[in-house]
């Protein structure tokens, strides 16, 4: 191999090395962006005003958590818990898909659920991912939640009392067996928890049939 051929060979090797490094750097940059976007916790604060909200609930703070999907480790769970604490909520509402159906890790979800009742009362409805778990996994999740003090609502009605005033809370995981829950509503202000946005119209119409209405629907959101 003459001098020129050796020079071209060295150049080719150098070019290949540079290309590989660029690909690795780009891959790392893409991975870093993916990890950041999937572990960064953004708190979105909304204020809602209602003419019929009882005076005792004036200034009430609610934290809604949805689609946790047991995807994150202890560090993320700790940070998320601190974010929730910082909001100083009166109630925490968990609206489904706390466990992932494809890669289920019930213990990890329960690790998070265990921390929430230490902050304030917690109410939970299940989503499609919980219902697509095995029966054993689903029962493990529900039993764990209830043992930690999380109130799991199955198509049922309960009440929340604050400063002497009471409002209704409805929690649904499907559109079946809803008549008993709606028939129990006697309060003027009603909150609905449900995972499925497409069901909201149905529940609104059903509420009217039972002589009541829904003031606030909290449903599936795309990120916890």
Task: List each language-model region with its residue ranges.
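Alpha-helical scaffolding within the catalytic cores
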Residues: 43-50, 79, 108-111, 152-156, ...
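Residue-level detector of conserved catalytic or cofactor/ligand-binding positions
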Residues: 217-224
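Mobile, glycine- and charge-enriched loop segments
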Residues: 41-74, 184-188
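Conserved catalytic scaffold of divalent metal-dependent phosphoesterases
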Residues: 52-53, 70, 130-216
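Structural motif
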Residues: 62-64, 93-95, 123, 169-171, ...
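N-terminal membrane-anchoring alpha-helices
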Residues: 1-52, 56
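Short, well-ordered secondary-structure micro-motifs
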Residues: 4-8, 15-16, 75, 104-105, ...
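Membrane-embedded segments
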Residues: 60-143, 148-151
């Amino acid at each position: 191999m003459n001098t020129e051929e050796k020079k071209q060979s060295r150049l080719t090797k150098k070019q290949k090395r540079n290309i590989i490094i660029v690909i690795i750097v780009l891959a790392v940059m893409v991975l870093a962006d993916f990890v950041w976007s999937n572990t960064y916790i953004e708190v979105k604060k909304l204020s809602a005003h209602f003419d019929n909200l009882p005076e005792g609930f004036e200034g009430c703070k609610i934290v809604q958590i949805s689609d946790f999907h047991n995807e994150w480790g202890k560090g993320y769970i700790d940070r998320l818990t601190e974010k929730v604490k910082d909001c100083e909520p009166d109630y925490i509402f968990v609206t489904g898909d706390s466990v992932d159906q494809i890669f289920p890790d019930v213990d990890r979800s329960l690790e998070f659920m265990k921390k929430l009742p230490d902050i304030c009362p917690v109410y939970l409805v299940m989503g499609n991912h919980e219902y697509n778990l095995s029966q054993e996994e689903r029962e493990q999740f529900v039993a764990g939640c209830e043992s930690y003090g999380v109130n799991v609502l199955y198509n049922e009605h309960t009440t929340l009392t604050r400063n002497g005033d009471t409002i209704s809370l409805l929690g649904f995981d499907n559109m079946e067996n809803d008549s008993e829950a709606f028939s129990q509503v006697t309060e003027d202000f009603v909150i609905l928890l449900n995972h499925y946005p497409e069901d909201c119209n149905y529940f609104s119409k059903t509420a009217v049939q039972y002589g009541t209405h829904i003031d606030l629907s909290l449903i599936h959101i795309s990120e916890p």
